[in-house]
């Protein structure tokens, strides 16, 4: 669909490319969301084509064992 917007999530606990892949998969599993995760910056930029709540984004990442510091 059309991109509605994007959010940047600051995430701690990612240490390697496996962590990046895990976070990417977790976010991409949300319908309408696509993530670009940077290990170096410790963040995920999430593009979405429907409204996705910060709570939903936070939950899927924290369920994998990472900590979400902020979403904006």
Named regions from a protein language model:
Residues 1-72:
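Flexible metal-binding regulatory segments at protein termini and peripheral loops
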